[in-house]
Structures are given as C-alpha cells and as structure tokens.
From Swiss-Prot:
Name of protein: Nitrate reductase [NADPH]
SUPFAM superfamilies: Cytochrome b5-like heme/steroid binding domain, E set domains, Ferredoxin reductase-like, C-terminal NADP-linked domain, Oxidoreductase molybdopterin-binding domain, Riboflavin synthase domain-like
Lineage of producing organism: Eukaryota, Fungi, Dikarya, Ascomycota, Pezizomycotina
InterPro entries in alphabetical order: Cbr1-like_FAD-bd_dom, Cyt_B5-like_heme/steroid-bd, Cyt_B5-like_heme/steroid_sf, Cyt_B5_heme-BS, FAD-bd_FR_type, FNR_nucleotide-bd, Ig_E-set, MoCF_OxRdtse_dimer
Listed Low complexity bias regions: 63-110
Pathway as given in its UniProt record: Nitrogen metabolism; nitrate reduction (assimilation)
Protein species of origin: Neurospora crassa (strain ATCC 24698 / 74-OR23-1A / CBS 708.71 / DSM 1257 / FGSC 987)
Binding-site list for FAD: R776, A777, Y778, T779, L794, V795, K796, I797, Y798, Q810, M811, T812, S860, T863
Gene: nit-3
Length: 982
C-alpha cells in the first residue's frame, strides 16, 4: 500500500492562525510610566499558547510586583533558597531617571519593539548548601539539574522550564558547562559586588597577539566605551556539543556525562564583533605571515592547563558569522558561571568554542594546541572505543589531533517538548474527540535555517509537516540605529540564523490513540536531515537521531515516555527497553522485529575475584590468631578469612610495616579499600583458614583492648594498630585542584610520630555509603618527628572529569567536602623506606649508606620526595647529594615549587641539592626543561646505574610514569634494589 503523501500545510509563520496562537510578550517600561505604552509583560517569549490561554497569559503578565518562590522542602528550613523575580537591566546612556519604574532598555525613536525581550531576572539570595562545599561558593538556581554532582558545575534547565520561558532564557536558568572551578578573581556573586571589585573587573584585560601587525591589550571598560568600539546586541542560541548525550550513554557508555535534551539556551548578547577587533590588530595573512587560525584562552586553571580552543581566521573576520567578545547577557553583566566579566560567543558552533573568562586571543598558523581543543569536542570514528581512545600510542595521538574530527558547526537537531515525559492525556468523553498540539524546538548550525520539521505517527512510513515559528526574525524588523542594552541591534542585514526555532502541529487524539509513538526529524537549508539511527562516538557528542516519544495506552488515557532523562536516573523508554533485553542498535529502537531472529541483550555479570583457596578447610580460633600478632609471623583477617603475610614481608610495595601493622587484626575495610583486583587475586596463595564462628565478634570487641593506645595524652599521635582521630581545622588552597589540609592533634605537644620517608593511612566515612569507609595512604608535608600539635597533608583533589569518563577521586572529593571541625582517622606509620639522616637509610629494615639520591616525581608524588630532600637540606652535616626531577604537564601543576626552591637555596653553599622541572605542555614563557620525563632526559640527567651501590633512585608519581621510569632505568643498568618506589 502506498504511503500517504506529506501533508501539505501552509507555514504558520505568516498565517493569521499562527499569529493568534503565538503571543509576543514584550517587556514593560514599568507600572505607571508614561514614556512608552507597551502592555505590562514578563518578557522573553515568542511562545506558542493554546488559543484560549492567550488572554489569561497576557493578564497574568501585567503585574510588575516581585514574586517569591520557595524551592525548599519546608518553610522552616534554614537552608531554603529564596528567589525574587524582578526586572533588572543594564541601560543605555539615556536611562529614564524615574526610579519608581524600570527604565526601558531600548534606545530609539520607534514605537514599541516587535521582538522578544528577556524574561525578568530571578534574584537568588542564598548559596545552596551543596555549593558551600565546592571551591565556587556561588549563588545558583536550585532548579538547574546537576549532571556531574556538586562540582564542577555542569547543569541544564528542566526541559519544561526551558521551553516555557520561550525564546530567551533567563541568565539563572541558562545551561552551564564548567571544566573546573570558577577563576577566583571573578567568583564573587554579582549581587554582592562592591565598588572596588566592580572596578577591578572593568579593568580586566585581554590581549590580541600572535601573527598580528598591531598587538592589542583591551580592558572591559574600554570594550564598553561606545566612542572606542561599536557595541552590538543580538540573540544567539548556545548549544553544548553533548546535548542529548544520555541517549548515546544508554546505548553504549561514552566518555562524557549524561546531558538530556536541555543542553541549550538562548540569550541577547552585547559586546564587540571579533571581526572589528581583528581588523584593528591586522592579522598577518600575507608576506610570509601565514595566519589562519584564531585561538582563545580563558583564565580558568584546570588539571590540563587553562581552557582554550580555536576557530578559523576566515570565520573570525567574517561579520556575517557574528563571533563576538561579549560583556553582557540579557542586558546584565555576565554571571561568573557565564564568563564574567568577558567571554567569546561563537554563533552556530558548539558551545565549547565560546571561551569564558577571556584572557588571550592569539592569531596563529595552525589550530590550537590546547589540551581541551585536542582531546575534547571531537567526533572520532565510531570504531574507536573508550579503551582504545585512552591508549598512549602514536596512532591514537594522530587520531586525536586530526582536525577533520574536530566539531565546529552544530548539526541539525530537534526535540519534542510537549507532550512532556510522563505527561498523561485523558481520552474520556468529549476530551477524546479533541486534538493535541505537539510542540518543541529545533536548531541548526553554521548560520543555517531550519527549513522543515516533520512528524510521523507510524515510525517513518508517512510524514506530515509542522508549522515553524522563527522568533529571531522579529529582530530583523527593528529600525536602523535601534539600540538594545547599550549595543546597536545588529540583525536586520544578516542572512544567517543564530537561534533555535519553535514548531507545532495539531494532531487529533483519535490518531494518537492508534499510534505506538511519535517521531520527529528536522532539515536545514543545506538539506541536512536528522538521521533515524544514532552515530555513536567515544565522546558522545552531536547526537541527533530522530527524537522519539513512546505512547503508552493505559485504559482511557495516554501516557508519554521520552527516550531518557538527564543525569544517572534510569527513566525513559531507552533504559526500560535495555533492561527488558531489547537491542537498541537493531534499527527499531529495541523493539522485536517481525520475522527477525530475536536478539536478547544481556548485561554482563560482575566477575567477583575469589580471595580464598577452596582446598583450605582449617578453622582458626581467636587465641591462635593472637599468637601471630607480632612481626615474626603476622596473620591477619579479611572477610572472616585468615591470611599469613610472612611470605610477602619482603615483596609488599608498602613495606613489611604494612603487614606487621595488620597482624592479629580484622583489616577487611582497609584491605578492600586500598587494594587492586590484582592484589585480591594473589590472596589465595596466603590463605590459611577461616575464623571460628564466634571469633569475628570477639575480635571486633577486643579491637580497643589497650587503653594506652588511644589515650589522648600520649606523646605520639600515630599508632600502627589503632585508628586515632584528628580534627580538620583549615583548608589552604595552593592551586585550583590542590589544598593543604590542616589537622589538630590530641594536644599541642603531641608529635606525629612519622619517620622521614614513611606514610600514614587516612580513613573517612564514605558519603555515598555511610556504613563503609574510604581509606588511602598519604605522606604529610609536616615534619613527622619535630612538628608538634598539628598535621598538614597536601592533597591533589581529583574532581570528576566527565569528558574523560572519570568519576573523580573518591577520597579526595570526600575530604574536600568535609566541614571544618570534623574528625578524620589516621593510622601508621607504613612504608618500607626510612631516611635516618646523613646518608643512612633503611629498606625493609635493612640499613644501607648512600652518597646520592636521584628523586623522580610528578604531581602530588612530590610529598615523600620533599620529605627526604628537606631532611638532607636542613642538616648542614649531611653531605648527601640530591637531584630532584619533577615532571608535570603545565606550570600550574607543579606542587611545592617554592618549598623545593627554598631547599636548593639553603643547601647552596655546598651545592648538595638541585631541582629540575620539566613540562610536557609548557607555556611560551617557561624557562625550564621541556618534554616528558623520557629515556632521553633520564640518560642526560641521571646517567648509567651506579655499580658501587652508592646512589638510590626514589620514585613517586602516576603509575604510568613510575612504570616507564623503572623500565628505562633498568635498560640503563640500574639494579632493582637501587630503585625504590614509594
């Protein structure tokens, strides 16, 4: 049977029917103001309304009284957040001085504007409790959906709220993509800025440099000066490249976090066109200059350096592309989350190109070498999986750097917003004879217009056209010279489309009740069409298959189910189908295909590693266990099973103390928390029996049998077999992702009791599982033998990095979130190395004498290295030579640099200590070594193995670095006993 032809329907954009359905709510000049005669409105919207709702909507917007909405669960909650809705715009120089009403943001002699103005900004007065635990401490809207936990701040608005606000999104509901903390210099919430801080932000400068004839340095104050720069205003829809990624993650986990369909927002941006700025700088495109790209760099300090990216110079110089350096958003100064005080806005391209907190614009011959440009915002071939993408091979490096895979222009995309997820429509009586109006949004990239939106109720056998409304076109009708928010409205001459559009289609309920689902697809003016099938890629970006909403027929109602919901919730038809065994990649959304062989997808069971020897049947009493609680033959218990650690005293990476300290104890929590799967697989070798049924409880009750060990007045804090508490008193930030945590010991005269070169164990309750603990080993930066009353621990905080599929450090994030005044438990010392001073050290209890230490470290691995180097440097009688090789990616990653440099100065008279820093991604001004700690560098700086055994290599850093260094040193003739890994 021939499929019905596409329903031919006049575009409602120009029809009278459309004008009845869509109402433009225009911002009022204010209650009682006579200078303009617009109706009182709440702004923002060319929003589709039901015909019978128009009068109610207009009536409801005629009030200018502030409203307060309490989003707390109880009115008595001290942590509740109050939101005040009010009109608060920045104005042009002819601002109305009548303070009884808001002045108009529009400057012209024309009548009232026919284009949308922003909704009233929402004033939030309280920092949310979750943000008090992060480095940002910013006031944020509690309605925003957090996609990566509390930090970093990556959020999207609820789809319903986003759509209901219409064409323009309030600043407080605009989606946010932050890779790390907000730069501290701009993190003060705008509502609390004092004059001094405001001036400092107006004095914020960014540079234009590189391959230009006239380098520039421009302050925000200068940028806003109409006598110096042509400020313009126009609307732009920003879209995260990960919008709709959750759908890809359900099919197959990508390396990115789960955006829903709300990863986009639209605002009126005010600033100066990048083409004008570059025209003054004059890029050197000829005479051997070769300028082809424009790189942007922000002020945020991240694990991989500052955030930066690039676009092609030809685009940046094209006024029609509309790339802007913006300082206002919806008439307001930028919020810190949106780039305060100045940012780049790149219309039609993914949001990742619009760099926030702008500090540098650099004209170059090639694309940006910034880590975030190379290893983010790419659609790699679908054959590249998560494991392969992380391989450190030349081939994989080449794939990542292939500019063909970089994402610039957005692709065409569309979403069904109404019906919403979980919405129920009644079919009872007269209601069932009516219609339902499907509504949603669509967008395209590169300035291209969405030219059609098609809807199918039969899974693509037939299609019908929806009407499309383009609110952006209303700005093209503005009169020449009209200003908005201090910038010339710069839209009328453009052919490009920078914004989303709205579509709608009336469907008889009688047809919906026969359908299994509703699918939509959009096409842009280049005839690019949304595909039916998903193109999965390892970063999960640019997902744009047909948007499908399932219809559930439940008696006399219809219930609608969207594909997914943002975050980690398993809500939506995709998760449901997957759990039912459906194959989401079968081309039919996981449904069973008539005539096709059923292919049930089963989840792989989690493989548990056995830690017992099944042949061992011996029962061990508590008395027997206690006979082995010393150093001679240490036994310990894990999960009720008894293990003999004696054979592994020599080989344990943490030294014999790690085992003898556990002797006679149940160390289940500690063992499972810190040991790898490989370590667990080794355990059957040391398994000797099972505790008798009554022994575990008795062992637990006797764990604190010696009161002297926990006596707070004892002179030494650390105990090898007992956990003792210290109070967190202060967190000292030393870099964006590193802090020194200060703890108060039991009394001011108490020493830590940690020999040089040893570590301690730290234990915290797991916030996600209160009945479980997190345990990790750390090396304090305190002097473990001399310092009294306090304990200082330097910790690099591994924040969640969704782009790289990293959940973040369990311990470090929990420690960072811990409130001051809370207790943390410690135990120790542990470790196989002790430096006794003046060249004497011991390894696993065996003493040896050295004349030279070569210490290789990276990142927070510097802490045990610093301990040893300090012990050498502060003792004028210690003639041991020290060479420290500290390798990092960027200069901001170097920890304790000033302390290490001070040690060098202190030991300078005898020239005993040298420190060399090397960076794999150095900045232009870096004067130290460049490159990785590789074979070439180790051969040059360390040399061949010392056959006399008078030199030791001490090594601490990331596992990959440690393995590489050990392998290289082995090839250079270094013996295993001369290379020690902390």
């Amino acid at each position: 049977m021939e499929a019905p032809a596409l329903e031919q329907r006049q575009s409602l954009h120009d029809s009278s029917e459309r004008q009845q359905r869509f109402t433009s709510l225009i911002l009022p000049n204010g209650v009682g103001c006579s200078s303009r005669e617009e109706p009182q409105g709440s702004g923002g919207l060319l929003v589709p309304h039901n015909d019978n709702d128009i009068d109610n909507d207009l009536a409801s917007t005629r009030t200018a009284s502030p409203t307060t909405t309490d989003f707390s669960s109880s009115s008595s909650d001290d942590n509740s957040t109050t939101l005040e809705t009010s009109v608060n715009y920045s104005h042009s120089s002819n601002t109305n001085t009548n303070t009884s009403c808001p002045p108009s943001p529009i400057t012209s002699s024309s009548l009232k504007p026919a284009y949308p103005l922003p909704p009233p900004s929402t004033r939030l007065t309280t920092i949310l409790p979750t943000d008090l635990k992060t480095p940002d401490h910013l006031i944020r809207d509690p309605r925003l959906i957090r996609l990566t936990g509390s930090h970093p701040f990556n959020v999207e608005p609820p789809l319903t709220a986003l759509f209901e606000h219409g064409f323009l999104t309030p600043q407080n509901l605009h989606y946010v993509r932050n890779h790390g903390p907000i730069p501290s210099s701009v993190a003060t919430p705008p509502a609390t800025i004092n004059k001094e801080e405001d001036d400092s932000l107006l004095n914020w400068e960014f540079t234009v440099e590189g391959l230009v004839e006239h380098p520039l340095k421009i302050s925000v104050r200068e940028l806003m000066d109409a006598s110096k720069w042509d400020n313009v205003t126009y609307p732009v829809t920003l879209v995260c490249a990960g919008n709709r990624r959750k759908e890809q993650n359900v099919l197959r986990k990508s390396k990115g976090f789960s955006w829903g369909a709300g990863g986009l927002s639209t605002a009126l941006w005010t600033g100066v066109g990048l083409s004008e700025i570059l025209a003054r700088a004059k890029p050197l495109t000829k005479k051997g200059g070769g300028a082809r790209y424009v790189c942007f760099e922000g002020a945020d300090q991240l694990p991989n350096g500052t955030y930066g990216t690039s676009v092609k110079l030809a685009w940046a110089m094209d006024p029609n592309k509309g790339i802007m350096v913006a300082h206002k958003m919806n008439g307001e100064n930028l919020h810190p989350d949106h780039g305060r005080p100045v940012r780049v806005v790149v219309p039609g391209q993914i949001g990742g190109r619009s760099v926030k907190w702008l500090k540098r614009i650099v004209v170059t011959k090639g694309p940006s070498e910034n880590w975030y440009h190379v290893f983010d915002n790419r659609v790699l071939p679908t054959t590249v999986g998560p494991e392969e993408s992380g391989e450190k091979t030349e081939e994989m490096e080449r794939v990542w750097r292939d500019e063909r895979y970089a994402i610039y222009d957005l692709n065409v995309n569309s979403v069904i917003c109404e019906p919403g997820h979980g919405e129920v429509v009644s079919l009872r009586g007269d209601e069932g004879a009516g219609t339902y109006r499907l509504r949603g949004y669509a967008y395209a990239g590169g300035g291209r217009r969405v030219t059609r939106l098609e809807v199918t109720l039969d899974q693509g056998k037939s299609w019908r056209l929806a009407g499309i409304e383009y609110p952006e076109d209303r700005y093209r009708e503005a009169q020449d010279g009209e200003e908005l928010f201090g910038g010339r409205l710069d839209v009328s001459w453009r052919e490009s489309c920078f914004c989303w559009c709205f579509w709608d289609l009336e469907i008889p309920l009688s047809e919906l009740r026969k359908a299994k689902d509703v699918c939509i697809r959009a096409m842009d003016e280049s005839l690019a069409l949304q595909p039916k099938e998903m193109y999965w890629s390892v970063l999960g970006m640019m997902n744009n298959p047909w948007f499908r909403v399932v219809i559930h027929h439940e008696g006399d109602t219809l219930r609608f189910e969207h594909p997914t919901q943002p975050m980690l919730t398993s809500d939506g038809w995709m998760d449901r189908v997957k759990k039912e065994g459906g194959n989401l990649a079968n081309g039919f959304w996981g449904e069973k295909v008539p005539g096709a062989e059923e292919n049930v997808v089963k989840e792989e069971p989690v493989k548990e590693i056995s830690m017992v020897d099944e042949k061992v049947t011996r029962l061990i009493t508590l008395e027997e266990l206690r006979q082995h609680d010393g150093e001679e033959e240490p036994w310990f218990v894990v999960n009720g099973q008894v293990y003999n650690g004696t054979p592994f005293l020599e080989g344990h990476p943490g030294g014999a103390a790690s085992i003898t300290g556990a002797a006679g104890q149940d160390v289940t929590d500690e063992f499972l928390a810190i040991h790898s799967e490989n370590a667990k697989a080794m355990m059957p070798t040391y398994h000797i029996g099972t505790l008798t049924p009554s022994a575990p409880a008795a062992l637990k009750s006797s764990s604190t049998s010696d009161p002297a060990l926990s006596d707070p007045s004892r002179p030494i804090f650390l105990q090898s077999k007992t956990w003792n508490s210290a109070i967190l008193t202060f967190k000292e930030s030393v870099s964006p992702d590193t802090k020194i945590f200060h703890f108060a010991l039991s009394h001011p005269a108490q020493s830590i009791g940690l020999p040089v070169g040893q570590h301690l164990m730290m234990r915290l309750p797991d916030p996600a599982k209160p009945t479980e603990s997190i345990i990790r080993a750390y090396t304090p930066i305190s002097d473990g033998t001399l310092e009294r009353g306090t304990l200082r621990v330097l910790v690099k905080i591994y924040y969640a990095s969704p782009t790289e599929d990293i959940k973040g450090g369990q311990m470090t994030q929990a420690l960072d979130a811990l409130a001051l005044g809370k207790a943390v438990e410690f135990k120790g010392p542990v470790g196989k190395f002790v430096y006794q001073g003046r060249g004497v050290c011991s390894v696993n209890g065996r003493e040896r004498k050295v004349k030279r230490f070569v210490m290789v470290c990276g990142g927070s691995g510097v802490t045990p290295i610093y301990q040893v180097a300090e012990a050498v440097a502060v003792d004028d009688q210690d003639g041991t030579e020290c060479l420290v090789l500290d390798g990092n990616r960027v200069e901001g990653d170097i920890l304790m640099k000033s302390e290490l440099d001070e040690l060098v100065e202190r030991a300078k008279p005898m020239g005993r200590c040298r420190v060399k820093y090397t960076l794999s991604r150095p900045g232009a001004e870096w004067e130290g070594l460049r490159g990785r700690l590789d074979k070439t560098m180790l051969e040059r700086e360390v040399g061949e193995g010392d056959l006399r055994g008078e030199t030791m290599v001490l090594l601490c850093g990331p596992e990959g670095m440690q393995n590489m260094v050990r392998e290289v040193l082995k090839g250079m003739g270094w013996k295993d006993e001369d290379v020690l890994v902390f």
